[in-house]
Every structure is written in C-alpha cells, then in structure tokens.
Amino acid sequence: MKQYIKLIKKIIRVGNQKKDRTGTGTLSIFGYNMKFDLKKGFPLLTTKKCHIASIIYELLWFLKGDTNIAYLNENKISIWNNWANESGDVGPIYGKQWRNWSTPEGHEIDQIKNVLIQLKKNPDSRRMLVSSWNVGDIDKMRLPPCHVLFQFYVFNNTLSCQLYQRSCDVFLGLPFNIASYSILIHMIAQQCDLKVGDFLWTGGDVHLYNNHIELAKKQILRIPRTLPKLTILKKPQSLFQYCFEDFKIIGYHPYPAIKGKISI
C-alpha cells in the first residue's frame, strides 16, 4: 500500500493545521486521489494490522440496510458504539440510504438493487451510482456519512468503482474504507459474472488528527509488504446473502497494530 504511505507523507509535509468539530485538531489537505488495481492484490494495509472482522461485518451490516448496532455487537464488533443512542440506533446512515432511500412522496428506493439491475442489463450506463448523502436526513444521523458517493464502471467485462469521501480520518478510518469498498467490488463482480478492476478513491478533507501524527510517523518507517489476496469461498444467490465465513484473506502478514484514539 505505497499509495497510503505516500498520502501520509504528503499530509505531514504540506498539511494545514485546522480546528475541527471534535476539538482534537487536524493536519489536513484538500483533494487527493488514489488508485488500486484489485487484480494485483487485496488492498489491506500491511504497515499495521487491520481488524478484518470489523471491516467485513460492517459492510454486511450496511448491505442489510441495518442502522442498529445490535448485529455488530452480536458479532463482537464495537466500532459504531460511540455513536449509537440508548437503543443502539445510529440514525438513517449508510444502510438506510443504500437500501431504503426515502423520497418526499413516501416511497423507498433500493439503490444497491438498482445498481445490480443496471450492471446486468445495461453495464455501459453512466447512472450506476449510490449516494449516502441524503440532505433531508442529515440532522437525524448520529454521524453523517464520510464516504458519500460511489459509482461503478464496466469495460471489457471488468468492474471498477470510484468513491468520493468528503471527510477522511487517514490513520484510523481510511484503511477500513479502502478494504471495505474493495470487498464490495469483489462481491458485486461475482454476482454479475464480471472480473475485478480498479478501486479509485477521491478524498475531500483528508486529515490526520493531531493525536495521530506521531503514530503515523512511526507507521511510515515500515516498508509495505506484499498484499494479501481475497477469496470468496462460495457464490450466494444474492448479494445480500453473504456471511462472514464466505470470505478468506490469504497471505496477510502485517506489522503489529498501532492503536490510536478515536475522535468523536
């Protein structure tokens, strides 16, 4: 993941010191692009160990259209606990918007299903997008979406995806985001009988929290290792029928984890 290390180095070199909502403060740049060729390996960070179970279970949670952390907690995943209310709900975030986007007329739109239909029937469409940024629901969300819009592209029977992320916690969040969308591309490619192509990532406010800067400096001293491979062990009848046990990461040999405090 040389792209990730290069990004950290740039933020440290030219980033702007900014105040932020959490009170922690950030070193920030505006506008950045990265590209990952999924044919060359699964882009799971090797310069520190990532908790792959959290990544997979969170993605499956989104795809269920779920917005209550009960499913995550049942599977010993706590990454959303800080934002849940007393009932375990986090508001109409990713899962709600992906699977049940509410219209002013009271209808609900399943954006993921619509994309799957287009990929199978009209793969040259330029309208294969999913948005999590529902302006009418923002005030109801415990944490508004950071990764807000993604688009699919098919050429030569190969599936690529581009993500726009308005706000990016580079040290803690970004490794999860890259891996999560790469898994999603693999899943959708399998369901649509396509090969995997590129994952393109675009960030808006791309930042290191001030309490992560020294940790990031430690991380960039580590030389990236060979990327692992992602294998999906079976093909369910539907994108929404995958389970954690269907995924296998082969050849993941990361450096030890570097723990950082999350800013809320």
Swiss-Prot record:
DUMP binds at residues 21, 126-127, 166-169, 177, 207-209. It is an enzyme of class 2 (transferase). GO terms for cellular component: cytosol. NCBIfam families: PRK01827.1-3 (NF002497), PRK01827.1-5 (NF002499), thym_sym (TIGR03284). Keywords: Cytoplasm, Methyltransferase, Nucleotide biosynthesis, Transferase. (6R)-5,10-methylene-5,6,7,8-tetrahydrofolate binds at residues 51, 169, 263. It catalyses: dUMP + (6R)-5,10-methylene-5,6,7,8-tetrahydrofolate = 7,8-dihydrofolate + dTMP. Homodimer. The keyword Methyltransferase applies. It holds the Pfam family Thymidylat_synt. It is found in: Cytoplasm. Catalyzes the reductive methylation of 2'-deoxyuridine-5'-monophosphate (dUMP) to 2'-deoxythymidine-5'-monophosphate (dTMP) while utilizing 5,10-methylenetetrahydrofolate (mTHF) as the methyl donor and reductant in the reaction, yielding dihydrofolate (DHF) as a by-product. This enzymatic reaction provides an intracellular de novo source of dTMP, an essential precursor for DNA biosynthesis. The keyword Transcription regulation does not apply. Pathway: Pyrimidine metabolism; dTTP biosynthesis. GO terms for molecular function: thymidylate synthase activity. InterPro entries: Thymidate_synth/dCMP_Mease, Thymidate_synth/dCMP_Mease_dom, Thymidate_synth/dCMP_Mease_sf, Thymidylate_synthase, Thymidylate_synthase_AS. Its main location: cytoplasm. Belongs to the thymidylate synthase family. Bacterial-type ThyA subfamily. Transmembrane segments: none annotated. This is Thymidylate synthase. It comes from the Bacteria. Its EC number is 2.1.1.45. One of its GO terms (biological process) is methylation.
